[in-house]
């Protein structure tokens, strides 16, 4: 996948109508935005376009309305908060059809530097199917397309891919530019030693990532629920831990592949276990990697935490995707905390691959210590798998 794409700075925007696909998929509670990170993240691109005298038309999805106009998933609260963040009015075009009379009127009345926000693109069932009619409607409002929503770059939808077919120029905003730089450099030209840390519940979610990263890394660290399938493949007892029986053979193959490639594959040497999947179950630390009958693994143990932290501290590039244990339970969060602390201390390029790891790092207050926290869980995973992301492919090459 070519990463050398036009950015907002490579295109003429003054006096032009610029349709910007943002990621405003923010959590709402009773119509109030509870986490506005994504709105703040979109500011540099929007402010640049406003300052350059573009007519800025913003669009995004919110939640999963599944092709129906659901009032609780309206972008109205987003328009209000964006107006405050930008310190200028963001006109909200409240059309259930997204590109309706309100949108057309608002766009027709725009002056250079004005900002309009369209309604939730997923109010239209065509959006997620990338159907041409809706792509054309979106494109009819604008002269140029800018995509700044990395979180949906792995989806071929009207507002991420289809619209680019009907406009002459398509560029990326600052958010996507940053994602491509950090994720791209890490995967294509990492400063070594390059360490990748994979956690989370399932091996099956990460099969292609493991396979692709074994071609690139010096050390691969595995934790979280997926580690128990690997421990079983090594011949350890795993009690009643989460395991994917149909992936045990695959785990063996990956261990062989790591050996053949000279990649260090680090797996837990001890575990923190409990009798129930419950925050209040008594935590017990095992002597070694074996998990006794009647217990389930819920976190990596202290020896493993130290082993993983050492590998991270000596790295020059670290990519992390997925927690080391059941992070939401305080008794089983220590492994995830240890890895986050080691990354914060490392003299390295440190990249968090979105999703749960990003939430964990931000909750622990280490967010500002990381080089880059990806804004897209699914998109960053597919990037690490070596897949082409349709939303990036659709942009104009430099």
Swiss-Prot record:
Binding site for ATP: 206, 297, 328, 354-357
One GO BP annotation of this record: glycolytic process
InterPro entries: Phosphoglycerate_kinase, Phosphoglycerate_kinase_CS, Phosphoglycerate_kinase_N, Phosphoglycerate_kinase_sf
Alphabetic keyword roster: ATP-binding, Cytoplasm, Glycolysis, Kinase, Nucleotide-binding, Transferase
Domain of life (superkingdom): Bacteria
Pathway: Carbohydrate degradation; glycolysis; pyruvate from D-glyceraldehyde 3-phosphate: step 2/5
Enzyme Commission number(s) of this protein: 2.7.2.3
Reaction catalysis annotation: (2R)-3-phosphoglycerate + ATP = (2R)-3-phospho-glyceroyl phosphate + ADP
GO (cellular component) term, any one: cytosol
HAMAP family: Phosphoglyc_kinase
Name of the protein this chain belongs to: Phosphoglycerate kinase
Organism in which the protein naturally occurs: Clostridium novyi (strain NT)
Classification lineage: Bacteria, Bacillati, Bacillota, Clostridia, Eubacteriales
Gene that encodes it: pgk
């Amino acid at each position: 996948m070519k990463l050398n794409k036009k950015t907002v700075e490579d295109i003429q925007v003054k006096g032009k109508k610029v349709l910007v696909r943002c990621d405003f998929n923010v959590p709402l509670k009773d119509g109030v935005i509870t986490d506005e990170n994504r709105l703040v993240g979109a500011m540099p691109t929007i402010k640049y376009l406003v300052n350059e005298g573009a007519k800025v038309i913003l669009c995004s999805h919110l939640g999963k309305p599944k092709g129906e106009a659901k009032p609780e998933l309206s972008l109205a609260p987003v328009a209000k908060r964006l107006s405050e963040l930008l310190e200028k009015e963001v006109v909200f075009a409240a059309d259930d059809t997204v590109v309706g009379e309100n949108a057309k009127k608002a766009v027709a009345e725009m002056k250079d530097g004005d900002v309009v926000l369209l309604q939730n693109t997923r109010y239209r069932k065509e959006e997620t199917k990338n159907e041409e009619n809706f792509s054309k409607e979106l494109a009819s409002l604008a002269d140029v397309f800018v995509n700044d929503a990395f979180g949906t770059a792995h989806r071929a939808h009207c507002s991420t891919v289809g619209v680019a077919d009907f406009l002459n120029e398509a560029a990326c905003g600052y958010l996507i530019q940053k994602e491509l730089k950090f994720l791209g450099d890490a995967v294509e030209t990492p400063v070594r030693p390059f360490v990748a840390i994979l956690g989370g519940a399932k091996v099956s979610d990460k099969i292609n990532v493991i396979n692709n990263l074994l071609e690139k890394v010096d050390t691969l660290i595995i934790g979280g629920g997926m580690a128990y399938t690997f421990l079983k493949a090594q011949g350890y007892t795993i009690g009643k831990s989460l395991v994917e029986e149909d992936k045990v053979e695959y785990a063996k193959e990956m261990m062989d592949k790591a050996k053949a490639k000279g990649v260090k594959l680090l797996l837990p040497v001890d575990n923190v276990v409990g009798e129930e999947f419950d925050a209040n179950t008594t935590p017990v630390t095992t002597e070694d990697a074996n998990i006794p009958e009647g217990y389930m693994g819920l976190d990596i143990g202290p020896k493993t935490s130290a082993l993983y932290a050492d590998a991270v501290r000596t790295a020059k590039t670290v990519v992390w995707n997925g927690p080391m244990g059941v992070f939401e339970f305080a008794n089983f969060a220590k492994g995830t905390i240890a890895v986050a602390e080691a990354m914060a201390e490392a003299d390295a390029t440190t990249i968090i691959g979105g999703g749960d790891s990003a939430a964990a790092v931000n909750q622990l207050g280490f967010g500002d210590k990381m080089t880059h926290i990806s804004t897209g869980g699914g998109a960053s995973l597919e990037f690490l798998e070596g897949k082409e992301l349709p939303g990036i492919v659709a942009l104009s090459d430099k």
